[in-house]
């Protein structure tokens, strides 16, 4: 057997929650390119169906399943539907997650409860239903990959999100210890700030500071996670469990944003923020390249960065 064959997922059956867009979509496409048949699970039926169709266009079997991960009955029905079409479940990527921004001294309990329900409880409900299926099938085995965050390790000034993701990391370790006897590997991946629609409205000054704090030199993109997902889904990680794999370009090696973010003058105008949002949503294309802001694509925002950080020609 070639060592490269350890990463081959042909014949494996996978599901990805939150698989319609962003990180989840990238994970679903990466698994499919490695050979796995993939169920795209999401509340967004239109985007989820589009991602599933994109996978099928590559000659790989795919399905879309709608599911609210906070509802145990829906989660159980989702796993049953995946198995009804695929026959078994080998790989599960639990990616569904949300963030609600706001000052922690002002956030209401409803917002807190919603974030914890999706990010932590939803991850547990999915992992539980997935493990039950993996235990029932023959051979008894499986790979469960939870998507956590660097915010589980460093304070990110968003208590509900940070706490929920820290919970995901420890949940992963606990389930790994419990389910190893069933030959189920449970691991998690902790990305940095990733350029996805969920983060489209993050202020430009904050984004540029994130880039500066990332030793590998660019704000993280969904494709930066693909290798880690394939590794943890494949036979290459058969003796790896309980791991929190930090995939952040080295960001957590540096200080986080709290003092800098609050001390940088707000020199990006509302008009420039509007232009940024349109770019980030794909109307005019992402305004970033490997070096950060691309002045050829977005000259007015590049000028705003220069002003905010005192850059001189």
Q: What are the functions of these language-model segments?
A:
Residues 2-5, 241-313:
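Short C-terminal tail/terminal secondary-structure segment
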Residues 93, 180, 185, 240-242:
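Short, small/polar-rich loop/turn modules that mediate ligand/substrate recognition or access, typified
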Residues 103-104, 108-116, 199, 210:
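Substrate-binding pocket helix/loop in short-chain dehydrogenase/reductase
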Residues 127-128, 173:
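A short, exposed helix-loop element centered on a Lys and neighboring polar residues
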Residues 132, 177-181, 238:
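Alpha-helical segment proximal to the catalytic Tyr-Lys
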Residues 145-167, 172-181:
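Catalytic loop of short-chain dehydrogenase/reductase
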């Amino acid at each position: 057997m070639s060592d490269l064959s350890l990463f081959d997922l042909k014949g494996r059956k996978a599901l990805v929650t939150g698989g319609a867009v962003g990180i989840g979509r990238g994970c679903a496409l990466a698994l499919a390119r490695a050979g796995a048949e993939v169920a795209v699970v999401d509340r967004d039926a239109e985007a989820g169906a589009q991602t599933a169709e994109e996978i099928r266009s590559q000659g790989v079997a795919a399905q879309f399943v709608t599911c609210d991960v906070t509802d145990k009955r829906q989660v159980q029905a989702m796993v049953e539907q995946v198995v009804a079409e695929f026959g078994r479940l080998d790989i599960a990527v639990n990616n569904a997650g949300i963030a609600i921004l706001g000052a922690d001294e002002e956030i209401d309990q409803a917002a807190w409860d919603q974030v914890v329900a999706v990010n932590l409880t939803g991850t547990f409900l999915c992992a539980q239903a997935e493990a039950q299926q993996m235990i029932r099938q023959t051979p008894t085995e499986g790979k469960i990959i939870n998507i956590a965050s660097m915010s589980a390790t460093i304070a990110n000034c968003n208590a509900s999100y940070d706490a929920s993701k820290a919970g995901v990391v420890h949940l992963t370790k606990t389930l790994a210890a419990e389910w190893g006897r069933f030959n189920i590997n449970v691991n998690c991946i902790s990305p940095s700030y990733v350029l996805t629609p969920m983060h489209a409205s993050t202020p430009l000054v904050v984004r540029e500071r994130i880039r500066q704090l990332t030793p590998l030199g660019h704000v993280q993109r969904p494709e930066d996670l693909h290798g880690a997902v394939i590794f943890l889904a494949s036979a290459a990680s058969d003796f790896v469990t309980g791991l929190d794999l930090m995939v952040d370009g080295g960001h957590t090696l540096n200080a986080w944003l709290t003092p800098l973010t609050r001390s940088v003058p707000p020199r990006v105008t509302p008009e420039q923020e509007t232009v940024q949002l349109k770019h980030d949503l794909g109307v005019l294309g992402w305004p970033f390249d490997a070096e950060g802001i691309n002045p050829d694509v977005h000259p007015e925002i590049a000028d705003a960065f220069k002003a905010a950080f005192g850059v001189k020609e």
